[in-house]
Amino acid sequence: MNTMLMKYTGFLCGAFSAKGRFVPYGNWQGTAISDSERELCSNFYYPEFVDFNYGANKNSISRFTMEIGQVIPVEVGHGEDARNVSTSVHSITLYQAPFGLMLFSIRIGLQCEAGDVTAVVARLRNIDLIHKTNRRFADAVLAPLMEAYRRYSRSARDIAGMDDDLCHTRLVEYGNKLKVFQIATTDSSEREGIDQDELLFELGTVAPVGSYDPENDFSPSKAYYDRIMDGNCVSVFNNWKALSLFDTFTFLGHDISEGNIENWISNYFGMIYISELFVKFYLFRLNNDFRISHKRADKLLEQFDEFEYSCWFDQVSYNFLPRLIHHSMEEGLEILTEKERLYQMIAQQKDKREKDDDQRMNNLLFYLTLFTTFSMVWDAGSLFNEMYPFETYLGSATEGFRLVSYTLLLAVLILIILTRFKKR
């Protein structure tokens, strides 16, 4: 495959459970938008969605950024093909989201051949290996994130005494690698002889460039390639196409203006993708709370209803393109399917628990009724004996008490049987 030089901006994203409100320290700075920017943004996006992303209440996302500003070499390739690719690490951002979730993104930049782009991303998104393969990146980027984790994570005590590699994996509480949002652009002159769909597929799957070639060991099957490209692509204009997958969202374009790129960064990544990642990570944790921690289903449903009311947006924009991008991200992350099935399972468990509770209560009432009945039998026998002395009418007090007891118990038994039959 011919080589292609490209300009690349990527965001490596993860999340962990957090406690308390984040208070900036050290080089962390809070980021917000002005009232005029909020008003302008609300002309394009629903005001409630803008408020969710930039509001100041407990049901909105607060953002904190630390500038890194370093160019870090990342070694890619093996053996004789090993080489260092200069990678600009611009900044890291924390997103304190509702329901105790802390998301983060690492912004990187590249200007290199397409093959080096996928190699760098493949290396950096595997967070469990970074400490061994790139100590400088670990110190510059992961160390500040780990400090935030130690201060605010709900599981910070669990990492005491752990190796650095294991500690870093805690930054990806849900999964084993970082999610990636990436923008790759080229000049028209670089496109000649290169199949753009194949390149988009390789970027989106973080596969070696050229792996589509049937002779390559990583070559995908035609059925898989067609399914991905037919079902997950977003294509509106001739100069770009996007691919929305579970682990990545990839924009590939040519002759794209800086203003357009900034729009993708600030809005499609900064608002839509971050909000969708929040939803996905929330569903991951909800599933864990339900299946692993076995938390009460009724409490989880109450929380889910609150989440759906304050943090779930079926539509986010007045305009067609943001709506299209939003729904493509939902589909790529498989959000709707997981959300519906998880809600259904929790609701079923809640109904089962309520039925079990009702059954236990009915059983308790049944035994109390029996106890009361036995007490009533003796009292009734004594009353009848006073009114109609058993020795006079039956010749024996014992026979009298026995007759009354059997009669009353038979009546109670018939009543219980009739009641149970009607319930069925």
PLM regions with names:
Residues 155-168, 297, 303-306, 362-364:
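A broadly tuned preference for mixed-charge, low-complexity surface segments
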Residues 89, 237-238, 402:
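Short beta-strand-initiation
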Residues 1-234:
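Short Lys/Arg-enriched alpha/beta "domain-start" segment
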